[in-house]
């Protein structure tokens, strides 16, 4: 499964989200992002996810890294992490 994550930097600060009580890994911290949909590239996926999750229009910057992780159940997660250059709107 391919997923994206956003790194928002403001000086030494970064933005994290806390997973909801009804989600797997409830209460854990994570970077905003989400799953690729069919035909999407990384920046398109992340732009859509940030609008859906946070209500912002983000300018996606450089790809920072792609990391693969295998869960205990054997599912392979491919995480594409991007820098956020700027955004408009107020984070919800």
Regions found by a protein language model. Give the residues of each.
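Residues that recognize and position ribonucleotide moieties
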Residues: 7, 29, 75
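Active-site-adjacent beta-strand/loop module that shapes the phosphate/pyrophosphate-binding cleft
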Residues: 2, 10, 57-59, 67-91
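The catalytic Nudix box helix
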Residues: 31-64
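Surface-exposed, flexible loop/turn segments at secondary-structure boundaries
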Residues: 14, 22, 69-71
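Conserved N-terminal beta-strand and adjoining loop/helix that marks the start
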Residues: 1-15, 35
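A conserved beta-turn-beta hairpin within the catalytic core of GNAT-like acetyltransferases
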Residues: 23-27
């Amino acid at each position: 499964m391919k997923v994206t994550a956003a790194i928002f930097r403001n000086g030494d600060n970064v933005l994290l989200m806390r997973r909801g009580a009804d989600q797997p890994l409830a209460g854990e911290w994570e970077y905003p992002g989400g799953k690729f949909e069919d035909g999407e590239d990384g920046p398109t996926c992340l732009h859509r996810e940030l609008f859906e999750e946070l209500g912002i229009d983000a300018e996606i910057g450089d790809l920072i890294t792609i990391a693969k992780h295998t869960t205990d159940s054997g599912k392979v997660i491919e995480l594409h992490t991007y820098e956020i250059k700027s955004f408009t709107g107020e984070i919800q």
